Amino acid sequence: TVINVKCTSPKQCLKPCKDLYGPHAGAKCMNGKCKCYNN
């Protein structure tokens, strides 16, 4: 799921993704936006 959080690295996405999807969520930075995924 792409969320409306700007990023330059996946580390910036980890907290918002975990906040939204729980502690097992993963995060990537794609095209300057965070992408969350559940493993």
UniProtKB/Swiss-Prot annotation:
GO terms for molecular function: ion channel inhibitor activity; potassium channel regulator activity; toxin activity. The record marks K28 as: Basic residue of the functional dyad. InterPro entries: Scorpion_toxin-like_sf (IPR036574), Scorpion_toxinS_K_inh (IPR001947). It is found in: Secreted. The record marks Y37 as: Aromatic residue of the functional dyad. Keywords: Disulfide bond, Ion channel impairing toxin, Neurotoxin, Potassium channel impairing toxin, Secreted, Toxin, Voltage-gated potassium channel impairing toxin. Has the structural arrangement of an alpha-helix connected to a beta-sheet by disulfide bonds (CSalpha/beta). This is Potassium channel toxin alpha-KTx 2.8. It comes from Centruroides elegans (Bark scorpion).
